């Protein structure tokens, strides 16, 4: 077997580095360099590939439910749902390398929720994994969240970053333009010079996709700058998932990046091997045979 030879000025023989006139990878990179500050994806199982608890749950109406690892769907008597790990076989998310998604279908509608009722999907972070954001310092970094989403509804949804350590919140919105079509969304959130994330293994941050809720969650104003958390601000742009049994919502390819990126500059999703993804999930849940 012949092995490639290494040249300190050219790298692998026959390949010219960028510094010597080679061609840089352009999508999400600058001068051929990945702009990420993190070596691994900050969001674990963002491609929805690992589902230790099962791949389909029916008659879901309350409590914490995990159709895939690290993503928790939590309704409180606001509609009834089927939640699944969906296998993808076509569409733009599939064309971009995603083979699984988390899908929520409304099976019993509730178009008039009680004031305290809600339904959201969330994923959580330890503070020690968030220190690159330098939150609470004068050098605080912006946040960029990206994901693929599909629904029968053409409407606007709200996603929140919820700082548990300091009880602070900031919100962003995404618009679904075409029904039943995978669309990629990129949302920027501002830096926060107030309130550092604790540097430990306790819960510090929640990324929260609010999908429905009563007036206690819709009565405020969605904050575009970090502020003290108020429940009334968390679902101002109500997606109304429970409003009809025709409604569904699916998501995959969720990534959180340090810094501000656009749809053209955001680094590619970090596809891990299934084993690497699975072992990171085991830190939080182990389904013993």
Where are these regions (language model features)?
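Short, intrinsically disordered N-terminal pre-domain segments
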Residues: 1-13
């Amino acid at each position: 077997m012949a092995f490639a030879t290494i040249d300190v000025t050219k790298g692998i023989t026959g390949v010219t580095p960028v510094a010597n006139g080679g061609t840089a990878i352009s999508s999400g990179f600058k001068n051929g360099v990945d702009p990420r500050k993190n070596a691994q994806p900050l969001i674990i199982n963002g491609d929805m590939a690992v589902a230790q608890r099962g791949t389909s749950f029916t008659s879901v109406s309350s409590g914490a439910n995990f159709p895939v690892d690290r993503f928790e769907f939590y309704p409180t008597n606001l509609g009834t749902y089927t939640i699944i790990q969906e296998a993808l076989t076509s569409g733009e998310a599939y064309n971009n390398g995603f083979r699984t998604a988390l899908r929520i279908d409304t099976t019993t509608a509730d178009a008039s929720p009680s004031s305290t009722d809600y339904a959201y999907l969330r994923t959580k972070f330890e503070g020690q994994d968030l220190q690159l954001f330098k939150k609470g310092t004068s050098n605080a970094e912006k946040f960029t969240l990206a994901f693929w989403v599909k629904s029968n509804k053409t409407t606007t949804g709200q996603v929140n970053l919820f700082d548990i350590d300091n009880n602070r919140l900031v919100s962003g919105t995404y618009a679904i333009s075409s029904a039943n079509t995978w669309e990629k969304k990129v949302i920027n959130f501002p830096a926060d010079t107030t309130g550092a994330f604790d540097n430990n293994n306790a819960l510090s941050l929640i990324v929260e996709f609010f999908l429905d809720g009563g007036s206690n969650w819709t009565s405020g104003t969605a904050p575009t700058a970090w502020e003290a958390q108020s429940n009334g601000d968390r679902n101002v742009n109500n997606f109304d998932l429970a409003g009809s049994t025709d409604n569904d919502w699916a998501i995959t390819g969720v990534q959180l990046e340090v810094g501000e990126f656009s749809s053209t500059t955001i680094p590619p999703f970090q596809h891990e091997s299934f084993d690497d993804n699975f072992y990171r999930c085991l830190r939080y849940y182990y389904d013993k045979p």
